[in-house]
UniProtKB/Swiss-Prot annotation:
UniProtKB keywords: ATP-binding, Hydrogen ion transport, Ion transport, Nucleotide-binding, Translocase, Transport
InterPro entries attached to this UniProt entry: ATP-synt_VA_C (IPR055190), ATP-synth_a_Xtn (IPR031686), ATP_synth_asu-like_sf (IPR023366), ATPase_a/bsu_AS (IPR020003), ATPase_F1/V1/A1_a/bsu_N (IPR004100), ATPase_F1/V1/A1_a/bsu_N_sf (IPR036121), ATPase_F1/V1/A1_a/bsu_nucl-bd (IPR000194), ATPase_F1/V1_b/a_C (IPR024034)
Matching PROSITE patterns: ATPASE_ALPHA_BETA
Protein's UniProt name: V-type proton ATPase catalytic subunit A
GO cellular component: proton-transporting V-type ATPase, V1 domain
Amino acid sequence: MSNLKKISDEDRESKFGYVFAVSGPVVTAERMSGSAMYELVRVGYYELVGEIIRLEGDMATIQVYEETSGVTVGDPVLRTGKPLSVELGPGIMGSIFDGIQRPLKDINEMTSSIYIPKGINVPCLSRTQSWSFNPLNVKAGSHITGGDLYGIVHENTLVKHKLMVPPRAKGTVKYIAPSGNYTVDDVILETEFDGEISKFTMLQVWPVRQPRPVTEKLPANHPLLTGQRVLDSLFPCVQGGTTAIPGAFGCGKTVISQSLSKYSNSDVIVYVGCGERGNEMSEVLRDFPELSVEIDGVTESIMKRTALVANTSNMPVAAREASIYTGITLSEYFRDMGYNVSMMADSTSRWAEALREISGRLAEMPADSGYPAYLGARLASFYERAGRVKCLGNPEREGSVSIVGAVSPPGGDFSDPVTSATLGIVQVFWGLDKKLAQRKHFPSINWLISYSKYMRALEDFYDKNFPEFVPMRTKVKEILQEEEDLSEIVQLVGKASLAETDKITLEVAKLLKDDFLQQNSYSAYDRFCPFYKTVGMLKNMIGFYDMARHAVETTAQSENKITWNVIRDSMGQILYQLSSMKFKDPVKDGEPKIKADFDQLYEDMQQAFRNLED
């Protein structure tokens, strides 16, 4: 019996399969038994990157992330045995990747061409650049588990890159590198567990379709301040929240997501341009390095806290699907360091269209509008990776990932499957309105259809810091809603026949719309509105409304009636000051001066109404 061959002696099945059929980005290969779902493969003599998305018998269906022209039947398909993964380590911030994390700048320098050659094999993070590494209080002999911080790399002046033990590793430290300069390939930590020694470099590799583990999810209770008045006051989002911005073409989705990445109170921004125009990504590349943010009195370029994943509309379709996962995995990595990360996905509709195209090539059953039946599940699995969490390992830290997804429904129709599936998942809906955009009212957020489900979660924050804010916001919504109802009557019978209080409502609503909700992203004073300024402006506008109504209601029965016309004629100056509150520049004037000016205006208003009533 002993001379019989064992299976283990035989050569394992070969690492090669062969191309059987090609249909656009979808390639079928034979002799692929033993391969796994979502395994990375190299197709053809160019070694194009692909991923297995279906297995039947020994046939595998592969979606290829590059142009497949020139692939012929019988070409070899090399199995790598690894899933599609991203490299996580120093060097991510400030760089621009394509959908499968190939560094576009390095490729450009290497080939000196504006095109990405086929099957190019470039390391995602530079292997030659050295980073200055400082160990934290971890010594040889100390025990360490997944997620523990063991060192810091000052990636740039804005982002401290904290090095973590990979989530599934554990053991006793045998060696930790002293402070000094190392590349991402140098071993800086060795651990021993059960007699096995593991070596770690600054680089971690993580599969993109798998969420990174956390200790627990926490309730989100801190607002994501965007610097846009209409969003911060009426429809706030939280750090760790999910938001959708649906809107037709030309409504300003991209401007909103760019201003979020410029001015929001996040530590790290990941901007995924997914199937949108290439010019928008180049605009980001051109604008961001010039924009600065002030941290502890030092001005820094915003590009230092931003990573870009560019997958424009002329790049291969299949890579669009990967780009969203690449972006969210990069975000989760920085979240695990204890940062608040915002991820902008512009736009998830193009991602859904990529799913639809691949699904059509696979001859799957189409559902609504030809999208695959699993569209909702895929969207949910992406959005649910957002949230505020307690990170793995020591020291204890909290991080969050907020996702802002732009949706471009065809013809601005919000009943489109992608929009309706997204609205069933996200908690905040900033609906953009074509009519407002045509009236040049930007940001063109329709205050009647938009909503936020985080109001209750944020009440504690407002009570602690801005106690008068919540009742004012409720009143603003009431005024805007009333104005909508009155506008129909006005169109029928004209303004003159309205009650005096209704005239006040109309005028204050006009003031709110023109000078509070509207905001010019391209002006120095208004491109960013800090929250104290938002609250100050609201306080004065609502104060004016309350005082005017009070004056009209108390004198309605008496001899000298105060009507809206009387108020308007005698308070021209105050109305002018109310509508020019937005011109106060937070950078030049500073917080104390703006607050003092707003308080002064409030006192002037009270005095003016006292004089009027006397």
